[in-house]
A protein has these predicted regions:
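Short, low-complexity, intrinsically disordered N-terminal peptides in bacterial proteins
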Residues: 1-2, 289
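Alpha/beta enzyme core
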Residues: 2-234, 240, 248-251
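Extended, intrinsically disordered, low-complexity segments
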Residues: 143, 237-289
Length: 289
């Protein structure tokens, strides 16, 4: 079974596939150790952590591929979906992005219909491409399966905030017809819209995106499953938690000249264990003179 096939099986299981957002090797390992079967690389999070910049079109194709490659290597055997933004160009660019991500070990990708430079789907000022342009990108990535480049493709549309929910659902439906594995209508604004998206796209593996502080109401996985969602993204939870913890630790250090209360920190050994030091010690002993 390929990594993409594993994701399809997980998405079709009794419970929805919940994907926590990760952005580096440590976050990926901690999410995996928490018990998640698969992960998603969040563009919002990588842009913040790697560049110190907002999700505003700054993160390049190669920067995202490099970030994905590093964290995928930290969790071997774990299916990872990567936020590929707009595919970084036209249909040919989207196909090249898929090739690069597949070579980096990714099991899937998210491909959206914003114009470049794109921005976070829960920000103002989004612009979307013509439907035909986006669908050409979807088709280009799907066609790679004929070459053995099988990606679990999540087709994301931001049309809800630009042209309305009807257009967003129509775009998602066409993407599914072309072979997208799951469809992602970004930023429905209330429970009624959430129900409609899940109902109208029930046969297309609808995706729910839970963004703390965003436009969409937050719902736990069981409620989303009852509506019919098959994939649930919590893409920025990790970076929000990390940012909060780091800001508090640095503020305490700056204010007191000493670190925060130890109860607010992982221990030295907890971190080294989380990144696999015991395994590396065993390897070192095995290969030492």
């Amino acid at each position: 079974m390929t990594p993409a096939e594993r994701l399809r099986a997980l998405a079709d299981a009794d419970d929805p596939l919940v994907l926590p957002g990760v952005y580096d090797g440590l976050s990926a390992r901690l999410a995996r150790q928490a018990g998640f079967d698969a992960l998603v690389v969040s563009g919002y999070s990588v842009s913040a952590a790697r560049l110190g910049l907002p999700d505003f079109g700054y993160l390049s194709q190669i920067e995202m591929v490099d970030a994905a490659r590093d964290l995928i290597a930290a969790v071997p055997g774990t299916p990872v979906v990567v936020d590929a933004d707009t595919g970084y160009g036209n249909a040919l660019s989207a196909a090249r992005t898929a090739r690069l991500l597949h070579a980096a070990g990714a099991a899937g990708m998210i491909l959206e219909d914003q114009q470049w430079p794109k921005r976070c789907g829960h920000m103002e000022g989004k612009r979307i491409t013509d439907r035909a342009d986006w669908l050409a990108k979807i088709r280009a990535v799907v066609d790679l399966r004929e070459e053995g480049i099988d990606m679990f493709l999540i087709a994301r549309t931001d049309a809800r905030g630009v042209e309305g929910l009807d257009e967003a659902i129509a775009r998602a439906r066409e993407a599914a017809t072309l072979g997208a594995d799951a469809v992602f209508v970004e930023a429905p604004v209330d429970a009624a819209e959430m129900r409609r998206v899940a109902g109208d796209l029930a046969d297309a593996r609808p995706v729910a995106n839970m963004v703390e502080g965003g436009r969409t109401p937050l719902m736990p996985a069981p409620e989303l499953a009852a509506l019919g969602y098959r994939v649930v993204l919590w893409g920025i939870t990790g970076i929000l938690a990390a940012g909060h913890a780091l800001r508090g630790a640095y503020a305490a250090l700056a204010a007191t000249g000493s670190g925060p209360d130890p109860s607010a920190l992982m221990t030295f050994d907890e971190i080294t264990d989380a990144v696999g030091l015991p395994d590396h010690r065993r390897l070192d002993e095995r290969y030492s003179g």
